[in-house]
UniProtKB/Swiss-Prot annotation:
EC id: 4.3.3.6
Active site positions, chain numbering: K123 (schiff-base intermediate with d-ribose 5-phosphate)
Gene source species: Saccharolobus islandicus (strain L.S.2.15 / Lassen #1)
Protein name: Pyridoxal 5'-phosphate synthase subunit PdxS
Gene label: pdxS
Known function: Catalyzes the formation of pyridoxal 5'-phosphate from ribose 5-phosphate (RBP), glyceraldehyde 3-phosphate (G3P) and ammonia. The ammonia is provided by the PdxT subunit. Can also use ribulose 5-phosphate and dihydroxyacetone phosphate as substrates, resulting from enzyme-catalyzed isomerization of RBP and G3P, respectively.
Pathway: Cofactor biosynthesis; pyridoxal 5'-phosphate biosynthesis
Length: 338
């Protein structure tokens, strides 16, 4: 069978099984008696730009769920999430409790890593280099430099090129997305307005990014040079974005996604995948809702399937949403980290 006759899912499954076999051999101690495998293991590259940018591609089409403990992580894995994001508090609780929001307890993150088989991500404060170094040492699969947590640096983000672990960053527009890419991010997510259960800001940010990419495509070279200066990014990055007609890295949607219909809407708008925060575990039906959101994200092109996903949940059990217009300017999380 030729490679191009295989589906992406079959290829992905093959590589996962290959990794499992390698781990079994390594754990059994047989690696010491198989010099060729030992040599291969020592030459495997990790942390390269290619590896860091490839990892998010394997999450495409899927849902990453915010969780705070092992039980929630297991629910997410059983529902079909492609990864989990570990926090100390869900965004809704961060918003309600106030104070300083920091990186989750490393012990909790470690427990989650030992309890599930899907990738584990965790958040750090914007600009907090050392929280990121701790998560890298812990062995998380991806770091989210997140506006949901209280920024450690109001002016600068982390230089992500210095790390071997991939990073995801939020963006509201193309300028923010390309600046984070230039800093070394491997994935972008729309900021939306986390912890509200209101998808309107995520919709707005996704549409802004798409619109600004379309404008870039029709610009002259001279105008693109001006735009690169405006965005404060290398011209080559602007040129590449115009050439491929999309962001150079994976772009997920996040912020206020609470229902299967929300999930399908963001995929329809062009998201490569989804981050779902408080919408799952601040609802009264997290098990069913997690499965329904995953189904809707995977089958967004088929309204009849999304309808069945929507029927799996009860609107009366959805999280209590927050009207964006009721928030004061200082209460908006999306304005952190421009």
């Amino acid at each position: 069978m030729r490679l191009y006759e295989l589906s992406f899912a079959q290829i992905e499954d093959f590589f996962y099984k290959l990794a499992e076999v390698k781990d079994i051999i390594k754990d059994s101690g047989l690696m010491e008696f198989l010099p060729e495998l030992k040599k291969l293991d020592s030459t495997i590259q990790t942390g390269t730009t290619r590896v860091k940018h490839a990892f998010p591609i394997f999450q495409k089409g899927g849902v990453v769920m915010d969780i705070t403990n092992v039980q929630q992580a297991q629910i997410a894995e059983e529902a079909g999430a492609v990864a989990v994001m570990v926090l100390d508090k869900l965004p809704y609780d961060v918003r309600k409790s106030g104070g300083v929001a920091r990186m989750a307890d490393p012990k909790i993150i470690g427990e989650v890593m030992n309890s599930i088989t899907i990738p584990v991500m965790a958040k750090v404060r914007i600009g907090h280099y050392y929280e990121a170094k701790l998560l890298e040492a812990l062995g998380v699969d991806m770091i989210d430099e997140s506006e949901v947590l209280t920024p450690a640096d109001e002016e600068h983000h982390i230089n992500k090129w210095e790390f071997s672990v991939p990073f995801v960053n939020g963006a509201r527009n193309l300028g923010e997305a390309l600046r984070r890419t230039a800093e070394g991010a491997s994935m972008i997510r729309t900021k939306g307005e986390a912890g509200t259960g209101n998808v309107s800001e995520a919709v707005k940010h996704m549409k802004i990014i798409n619109s600004e990419i379309r404008s870039l495509i029709s610009m002259s070279e001279e105008d693109r040079v001006k735009k690169a200066r405006e965005y404060q990014v290398p011209y080559q990055l602007v040129e590449l974005t115009a050439k491929i007609k999309r962001l150079p890295i994976v772009n997920f949607a996040a912020g206020g996604i609470a229902t299967p219909a929300d999930a399908a809407l963001m995929m329809w708008l062009g998201a490569d995948g989804l981050f779902v925060g408080s919408g799952i575990f601040k609802s009264q039906d997290p098990d069913e809702r997690a499965k329904a959101v995953v189904l809707a994200a995977a089958c967004w092109e088929y309204p009849e399937i999304v309808l069945e996903a929507q029927k799996m949940i009860s609107e009366q059990k959805s999280m209590m949403g927050i009207d964006i217009k009721s928030l004061k300017p200082e209460e908006l999380l999306q304005v952190r980290g421009l």
